[in-house]
């Protein structure tokens, strides 16, 4: 299924038998859940079919998003909570109460949060009070969850990508990439940030915005979600559909130098720069979960076509379907997710892979958790999924079949010994 055409079309590589394939990897701020497992298992199966059955020479690239607002906010939260845990009852109440109130308010003033946390850390004698820095703390957090994600993939039987790219290793190239888009006339600087000029791109004779999602120009709210939780005021934009390429960093946020001032990359430009650096000006396949269709992939496509000033950068887009829990998308924001680690305590990786194979990879899939009450704590916890019964039965047939084949081969003259 090619998302460009929304139909099944014959796949034809751009260059002989070689296939350049880029998929969007995890944003590493928390443990991966079953929705992630379905996404990467599906791509693993598709990749194996392409390379092992059709014998394409596949170059499979995956990125790790290790610069992101979610990571920055989580790093600050973990630091604040760690310092608050050291406060004894009745001590440093003014600072502690002020920090707790800020966290409870939901305000995203990371500069003030960092100031209060540092002051409280100094008061309680925390040894890291003067050393802690968001510039290093966010990356330590990202490294932790990247390692956990890669171990989850290993346990799930997902083959490693041929190349893994990290945003933190590409900041200089991202700056150069953005400058080229500005030089082409499709981006502009505003108050230390840089924005993609959607109207200029849309009005160019050889370009078109909203190729993947025809409603993209109308869905401003979803577009804003793609700007990140720490996005600047929308008044900096010339048009409401414009999106950020480079974010001016505020106090409490990590920052890198650029011609426009200290800041960090926007989400969409990260993939454009990394994919272009590895695969160049034409890409056979770009993939990810269906939630990335818009705004991420739509904007990634526009940026790259602006950079190369070409009509089509990607030949085929493939998107895997959502995994739902009782009809709702599994996500960390909804807090209805089951981690891969927890699922592997209930079922084997092979059983989970069979479960995913029972559903069309590009369609939504629904899971119904089976809960039981813990005898010791009295709390309810998920102990399985109603849909797993068929997958477990299939695995049993699979194991028995190959056990019999193995036995026949041993007894057959000329068979293996």
Q: Over which residues does each language-model region extend?
A:
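NTP-dependent nucleotidyl-transfer catalytic core
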Residues: 1-316, 386, 404, 409-416
